[in-house]
């Protein structure tokens, strides 16, 4: 058939193609043929002239270039692939790379399946040119051409629907008319676009003291802000200066500039990401639609993709893409094809187009979860953006960390996306090769916010040359353009200088505005504006197309595709997958709950329905409710950690945030309900609670419902706050209030009148009352002998009372009456707790109301509060003192002198050991499941003094592995072969004599640049070198790496600290500061840098080599200029085989000669570094010729390498070895290490403001809550119990400390592992400094908590008592710190460490003697666990200290009242008993009702609990022993468990 059935968007491919493709839906193979197109757009001409037509791209990947023949049709150059070669070419492609041509054929195959004939579309093809065809020149739609098979045509004739795939992807075709298919052709116009941000202030590093000051100043500042007064308001600073431009549909614009030029700001603001800036001026329109309307009604059509590929890591690639498709499937369905079938076909199409089909069932992963590769993860981001259906997309530095081959695949993927969908695409890239640059239509060059150029990409280079800037041979266009904006790197043409060339950003901006290209761009923009003004069809088509995509139930003004309830259902399915794919989390969750239920159930095993079991039964119910309720705290960090994905997907308009809030709660119900059910059934029946199905299910219902309420509460807290530390501080206060005012510790009638209202606002109190009433309303309590008053006390010789409760006796529990041995459970809870059975279902309604309220708040907050929108980086600086000011002034003076050519960098101070480094027959094998894998295979090589050697190869070839092996960094696997320094095996000093700049920039984030370099110099240079000399050398390194302006900036982390490029320079600087005598290893030193920064790094390495340094450096496909800087090359192919080692030669002559002698002809204009990789099959192309590894092993060059190695060894062995005492494992002594590292750790903790302030805040908050709750207790019986509960809060502190200490230690250990590899300091030093640095804060927290608790509650004022109490609190702090660090040292990850906490804390809390008194414990636990529990010593010591000699006077209502027998006084009847048990008779002479007070002093309370005042110092000593034990575990684990597998 003709092309009549294809919409206009899909025509004008630009090349007639015949190729065999597979239908992604599984249909039989069919021929795709396109007729020549009579004319070509300007875009096609540009791509053809660059040698990059779509056919060219496929042809470039073939083995035989002669298979591609050029064919010219009309005015445009076109190339045809012969039909008989297409299959061979497809077969010869590397399996995991992107082809624009092949991707379009995949698209065409699926499009063919759904395209149908229509009279109207045929009419469109033949109708005369109209205004619509003029618009098409601006939209420049896709070039995919499709044919229907005969079978499909027959179906079309039978009238089986009318559908087109592009229409489904972009808009539904409704009532086709002569104007053609409605399309979302959105051109972007920006006029006088100006962005103003915060500037003019040097922000100082926050520290512990400033965090406290901020906390108390914040309310005052907020009040001032209401009146428009802000003394700390930053000054405005232009980030982008006014600029104008147009990018038409189907065009791609490359945004270039040095770091801080404003590229990210432009990409964000051009796509309506306006958060975080002070003011944005000018106007931005999208096909005539203003930015405000676009944001409100069409938000998902204009999107920004940040450079990080942040996805849900445990979802597979297919699940991630399918979810996006489900939220964006249009309303109009394919006749006869369900929405699921459409999504299946689209998923297959995307996986095939982007060549990630092999990863469909692999999890996406992230930095912590192993998944697909970085390049494949980038393609998942592209697929997700594709699914969004957005028409304007911007991508920010998206090739960071990718090798050149993967980066080119990425650029081609964007080209494919832009062409097929007619999108408008903005991209910023670093180190863009020429192949990438050729994918773009326009380029925007920014220079400190000024536009230096905006126009056609093919004209940019000549424009800059015309200004007077000289380019270099083989220099890529992108590097040249950005280099023109760098005052240090740009070069002027002969006879030109800064006086006659636009040199400043302002001058370059002015020159551009006065240029012919700018005038042309302005005319183009005005024409497009006029078109938009005169003909609203494009705009209306866009609006109508968006409207037609919406499903039933979606408002016309909504920017979402599916309805709110559909969104909930789709997210619900995704969250279920997430939950149940987390096998480790599920298994540990079930195991934790069941084990803790077994422990608690065994402690309270089969509680008797007696008076002795009444209080412990309430304790069991309390623990059952509280444990599950507090496990919901995990919702807080998970809610905040998932914000970036939530924010991005909301920006894509996949779903409303409120839908996510509802769906995530619902998706957690099956798992949480089952976990709580198992916990409840074990706890309930082991504890001997009332045995009936109805009672159990009411218990389970309220435990689960309370959990759901608390889960909703923590989720609400998570979305209401932007900072986790703030949320954690709030949570610590609120949880403390909730636990205290549940009704278990203090009955509501006993609560202070100014705080009792908390009980009625506390969800836990309603849940606890319900399960308490459910239990006690069903049972009667029998008074056992130990609770009968008065009773026989045989050990005191008192035996005259009846064995059964008589009329003159009573039971000493709530609700009892004289002479009655049974107490109704209802009476017990009514008298003691004011709980009633009639409140059960009332409380159910209240809890449901709480849940609905928190869900409503959560939905409101998540909808209207920004969830992670403000992503911008700031630098923070150390406050400048006199010394720093002098150093910085000197650096500034020398920098100007360098620029003026008055100074040269002096490296003469470097003292290198002129010893060769060789390796022979190197093999490396690692264990894998089922066997072993060889990663390095028989590698030979050497590094001579003063040489710069490049280590290159394909991704996965073993470059980093070889570097790790040579640098002695591997700790797993088997290494074979010889690694020799100076002809001898490497010794203990090798690692400290070498420097290794790893690819990951791992640093102590709180240090400044200068401090990081100083610590490296102090610890890695010999101790005898004077400190001043080390400091001076550090200043030289700062100069060499051009870090002068950042010398006092904190390294920080992404978003709060140095940029990626600056962090990379710091990584190199830290290694150079060590003055490595032997060797310098660098792994990807230019990764993530812009072209000029990469050139600066390599240029500096050359200077080091000139001073005698030996350098081995891995690098990803450098441009020709960078490649020329290296002296020697070691090239690896996949499998860890060497394919070349030797000199590169001037202009790469030696390397080129080797390649050409072995059958790989190097084109004259090719970059040898890129070509050699393609020749060996490292890129998309299959290798040229036979196995290059075999060629190398049989080559004379290899024989020469082996001969040279032998000569180097012989020469080295002939020289005498100079014995040096400094050749020890570490450069400095243990004490010097301890002092230096302790100073750094102290600084780190001081600057980690939120970490320490959150800890202190929690202590203050808990101390204040306990004080207010138990303020100045009197000497009543109830107050006696309250004193014990107040002391029990000391056991809460370790839980808070563990939650903070463990992550802190493990994150610090990551830095230590990197530094330990360089032998900076020992593991013992690391562990001790981590411990010692925490001590001052532990002391401060202990003092704060002690003062509030001890004197607020009203404990004894005697100094001996207060001193002991304080010492125990202090030891508790230290114990918690040492325990947390010991657990962290034993754990490989933060998650594993966190799993220990519930077991430890539950065990310690249950067996300490408060919730379960020792007499009530089962024999098994009482025999060993109670005395072994560290908290037993804490509680015993504190209780005996506080209650010893404490006088007790019963208040009215606390007396046990029973009648005296006739003829006897109360003293005669019960006086001996009262004396024996430590109580007293209040009315001894009475002959009526006797008033018995069960305690006279505190001893009577704690002696039955097996606590003794005389053993309190023994308890203190045992507690100290636990601390010592923790420290020993910490030191041993730190020494032997590095938890780093390399």
From Swiss-Prot:
Keywords carried by this UniProt record: ATP-binding, Cell membrane, Glycoprotein, Membrane, Nucleotide-binding, Repeat, Transmembrane, Transmembrane helix, Transport
Glycosylation sites: 207, 397, 822, 923
Stretches assigned to the ABC transporter domain: 221-473, 917-1159
Membrane topology summary: Multi-pass membrane protein
PROSITE patterns, per the entry: ABC_TRANSPORTER_1, ABC_TRANSPORTER_2
Composition bias type Basic and acidic residues, residue spans: 60-69
Cellular compartment(s): Cell membrane
Coiled coil: none
TM stretches of this protein: 584-604, 618-638, 669-689, 694-714, 726-746, 844-864, 1253-1273, 1284-1304, 1335-1355, 1365-1385, 1390-1410, 1516-1536
Biased composition (Polar residues): 18-41
Effect of gene knockout: Results in drastically higher susceptibility to fluconazole (FLC), itraconazole (ITC), voriconazole (VRC), as well as to the eukaryote protein synthesis inhibitor cycloheximide (CHX).
PANTHER family: ATP-BINDING CASSETTE TRANSPORTER
Protein name: ABC multidrug transporter AFR1
Organism: Cryptococcus deuterogattii (strain R265) (Cryptococcus gattii VGII (strain R265))
């Amino acid at each position: 058939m003709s092309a009549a059935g294809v919409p206009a968007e899909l025509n004008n491919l630009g090349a007639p193609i015949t190729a065999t493709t597979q239908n992604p839906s599984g249909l039989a193979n069919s021929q795709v043929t396109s007729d020549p197109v009579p004319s070509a757009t300007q875009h096609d001409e540009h791509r053809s002239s660059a040698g990059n037509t779509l056919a060219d791209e496929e042809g470039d990947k073939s083995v035989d270039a002669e298979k591609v023949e050029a064919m010219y049709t009309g005015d445009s150059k076109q190339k045809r692939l012969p039909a008989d070669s297409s299959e061979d070419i497809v077969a010869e492609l590397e399996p995991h790379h992107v082809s624009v041509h092949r991707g379009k054929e995949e698209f065409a195959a699926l499009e063919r399946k759904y395209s149908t004939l229509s009279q109207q579309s045929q009419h469109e093809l033949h109708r005369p040119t109209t205004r619509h065809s003029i618009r098409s020149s601006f939209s420049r739609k896709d070039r995919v051409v499709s044919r229907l098979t005969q079978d499909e045509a027959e179906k079309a004739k039978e009238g089986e629907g009318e559908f087109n795939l592009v229409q489904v992807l972009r808009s539904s075709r409704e009532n086709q008319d002569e104007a053609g298919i409605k399309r979302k052709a959105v051109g972007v116009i920006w006029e006088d676009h100006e962005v103003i941000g915060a500037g003019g202030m040097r922000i100082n590093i926050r520290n512990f003291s400033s965090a406290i000051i901020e906390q108390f100043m914040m309310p005052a500042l907020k009040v001032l802000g209401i009146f428009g007064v802000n003394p700390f308001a930053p000054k405005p600073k232009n980030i982008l200066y006014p600029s104008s431009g147009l990018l038409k549909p189907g065009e791609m614009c490359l945004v270039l500039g040095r770091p801080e030029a404003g590229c990210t700001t432009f990409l964000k603001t051009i796509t309506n990401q306006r958060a975080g800036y002070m003011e944005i001026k000018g106007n931005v329109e999208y096909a005539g639609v203003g930015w405000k309307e676009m944001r409100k009604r069409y938000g998902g059509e204009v999107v920004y993709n940040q450079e990080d590929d942040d996805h849900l890591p445990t979802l597979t690639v297919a699940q991630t893409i399918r979810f996006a498709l489900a939220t964006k499937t249009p309303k109009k369905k394919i006749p006869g094809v369900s929405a699921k079938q459409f999504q299946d076909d689209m998923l297959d199409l995307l996986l095939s187009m982007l060549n990630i089909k092999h990863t469909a069932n692999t999890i996406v992963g992230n930095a912590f979860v192993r998944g697909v590769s970085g390049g494949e993860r980038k393609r998942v981001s592209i697929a997700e953006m594709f699914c969004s259906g957005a028409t304007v997309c911007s991508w920010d530095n998206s090739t960071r960390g990718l090798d050149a081959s993967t980066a080119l695949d990425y650029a081609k993927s964007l080209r494919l996306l832009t062409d097929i969908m007619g999108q408008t695409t903005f991209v910023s890239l670093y180190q863009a090769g020429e192949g990438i640059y050729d994918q773009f239509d326009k380029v925007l060059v920014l220079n400190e916010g000024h536009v230096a150029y905006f126009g056609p990409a093919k004209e940019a280079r000549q424009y800059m040359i015309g200004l007077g800037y000289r380019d270099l041979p083989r220099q890529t266009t992108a590097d040249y353009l950005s280099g023109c904006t760098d005052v240090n790197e740009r070069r002027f043409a002969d006879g030109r200088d800064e006086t006659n060339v636009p040199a400043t950003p302002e001058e370059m901006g002015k020159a551009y505005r006065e240029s012919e290209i700018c005038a042309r761009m302005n005319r183009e923009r005005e024409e497009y504006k006029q078109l938009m003004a005169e003909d609203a069809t494009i705009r209306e088509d866009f609006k109508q197309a968006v409207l037609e995509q919406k499903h039933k139930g979606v408002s016309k003004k909504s920017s979402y595709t599916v309805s709110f309830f559909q969104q909930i259902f789709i997210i619900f399915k995704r969250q279920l997958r997430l939950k149940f794919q987390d096998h480790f989390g599920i298994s540990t969750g079930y195991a934790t709950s069941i084990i803790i239920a077994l422990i608690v159930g065994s402690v309270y095993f089969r509680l008797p329905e007696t008076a002795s079991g009444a209080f412990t039964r309430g304790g069991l119910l309390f623990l059952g409710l509280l444990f599950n309720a507090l496990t919901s705290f995990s919702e807080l960090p998970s809610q905040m950690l998932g914000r970036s994905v939530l924010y991005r997907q909301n920006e894509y308009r996949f779903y409303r945030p409120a839908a996510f809030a509802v769906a995530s709660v619902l998706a957690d119900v099956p798992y949480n309900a089952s976990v709580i059910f198992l916990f409840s059934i074990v706890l309930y029946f082991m504890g001997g609670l009332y045995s009936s199905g109805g009672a159990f299910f009411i218990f389970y219902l309220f435990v689960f419902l309370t959990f759901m309420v608390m889960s909703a509460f923590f989720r609400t807290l998570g979305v209401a706050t932007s900072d986790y530390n703030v949320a954690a501080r709030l949570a610590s206060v609120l949880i403390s209030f909730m636990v205290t005012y549940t009704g278990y510790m203090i009955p509501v009638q006993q609560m202070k009148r100014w705080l009792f209202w908390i009980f009625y606002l506390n969800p836990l109190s309603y849940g606890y009352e319900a399960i308490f009433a459910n239990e006690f309303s069903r049972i009667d309590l029998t008074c056992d002998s130990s609770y009968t008053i008065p009773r026989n006390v045989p050990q005191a010789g008192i035996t005259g009372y009846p064995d059964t409760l008589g009329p003159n006796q009573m039971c000493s529990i709530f609700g009892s009456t004289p002479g009655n041995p049974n107490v109704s459970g209802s009476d017990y809870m009514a008298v003691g707790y004011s709980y009633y059975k009639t409140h059960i279902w009332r409380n159910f309604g209240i809890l449901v109301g709480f849940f609905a309220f928190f869900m409503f708040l959560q939905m409101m907050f998540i909808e209207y509060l920004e969830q992670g929108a403000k992503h911008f980086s700031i630098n923070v600086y150390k406050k400048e003192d006199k010394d720093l000011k002098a150093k910085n002034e000197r650096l500034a003076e020398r920098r100007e002198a360098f620029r003026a050519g008055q100074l040269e960098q002096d490296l003469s101070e470097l003292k290198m050991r002129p010893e060769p480094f060789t390796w022979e027959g190197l093999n490396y094998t690692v264990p894998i499941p089922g066997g072993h894998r060889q990663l390095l295979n028989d590698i030979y090589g050497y590094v001579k003094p003063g040489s710069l050697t490049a280590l290159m190869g394909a991704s996965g070839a073993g470059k980093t592995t070889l570097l790790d092996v040579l640098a002695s960094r591997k700790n797993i696997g088997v290494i074979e072969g010889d690694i020799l320094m100076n002809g001898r095996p490497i010794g203990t000093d090798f690692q400290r004599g070498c420097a290794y700049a790893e690819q990951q920039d791992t640093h102590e984030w709180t240090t400044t640049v200068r401090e990081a370099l100083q610590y490296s110099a102090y610890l890695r240079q010999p101790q005898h070198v004077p400190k001043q000399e080390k400091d001076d050398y550090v200043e030289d390194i700062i100069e060499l790496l051009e870090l002068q302006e950042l010398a006092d900036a904190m390294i920080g982390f992404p978003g709060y600290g140095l940029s990626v490029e600056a962090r990379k320079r710091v990584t190199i600087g830290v290694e150079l500061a060590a003055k490595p005598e032997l060797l310098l290893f660098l792994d990807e030193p230019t990764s993530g840098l812009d072209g000029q920064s990469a050139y600066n790094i390599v240029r500096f390495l050359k200077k080091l080599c000139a001073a005698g340094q030996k350098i081995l450096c891995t690098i990803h496909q450098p441009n020709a200029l960078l490649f020329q800087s290296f002296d020697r090359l070691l090239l690896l192919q996949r499998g860890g085989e060497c394919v070349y080692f030797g000199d590169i030669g001037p202009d790469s002559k030696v390397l080129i000669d080797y390649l050409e002698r072995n059958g790989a002809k190097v084109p004259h204009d090719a970059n040898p570094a890129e070509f050699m990789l393609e020749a060996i099959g490292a890129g998309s192309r299959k290798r040229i010729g036979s196995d290059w590894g075999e060629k190398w092993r049989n080559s004379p060059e290899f024989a020469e390498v082996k001969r040279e190695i032998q000569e180097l060894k012989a020469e080295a062995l002939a020289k005498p070895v100079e014995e040096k005492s400094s050749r020890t494992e570490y450069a400095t002594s243990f004490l010097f290490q301890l002092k230096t590292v302790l100073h750094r750790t102290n600084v780190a903790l001081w600057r980690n403001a939120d970490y320490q302030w959150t800890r202190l805040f929690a202590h203050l908050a808990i101390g204040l809550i306990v004080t207010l709750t138990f303020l100045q207790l009197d000497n009543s019986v109830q107050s006696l119990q309250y004193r014990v509960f107040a002391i029990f809060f000391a056991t809460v502190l370790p839980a808070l400390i563990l939650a903070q200490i463990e992550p802190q230690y493990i994150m610090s250990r990551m830095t230590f592992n990197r530094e330990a590899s360089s032998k900076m300091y020992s593991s013992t030093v690391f562990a001790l400094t981590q411990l010692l640095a925490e001590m001052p804060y532990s002391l401060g927290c202990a003092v704060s908590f002690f003062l509030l608790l001890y004197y607020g509650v009203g404990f004894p004022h005697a100094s001996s008592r207060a001193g002991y109490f304080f010492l125990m609190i202090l030891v508790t702090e230290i114990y918690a710190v040492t325990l947390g660090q010991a657990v962290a040292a034993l754990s490989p990850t933060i998650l594993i460490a966190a799993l220990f906490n519930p077991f430890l804390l539950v065990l310690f809390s249950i067996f300490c003697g408060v919730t379960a008194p020792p007499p009530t414990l089962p024999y098994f636990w009482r025999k060993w666990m109670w005395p072994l529990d560290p908290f037993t010593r804490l509680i015993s010591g504190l209780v005996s200290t506080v209650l010893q000699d404490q006088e007790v006077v019963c208040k009215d209502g606390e007396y046990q009242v029973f009648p005296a027998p006739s003829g006897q006084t109360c003293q005669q009847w019960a006086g001996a008993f009262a004396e024996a048990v430590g109580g007293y008779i209040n009315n001894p002479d009475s002959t009526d009702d006797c008033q018995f007070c069960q305690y006279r002093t505190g001893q009577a309370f704690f002696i039955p609990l097996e606590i003794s005042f005389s053993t309190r110092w023994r308890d203190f000593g045992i507690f100290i022993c636990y601390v010592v034990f923790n420290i020993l575990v910490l030191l041993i684990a730190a020494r032997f468990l590095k938890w780093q597998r390399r």
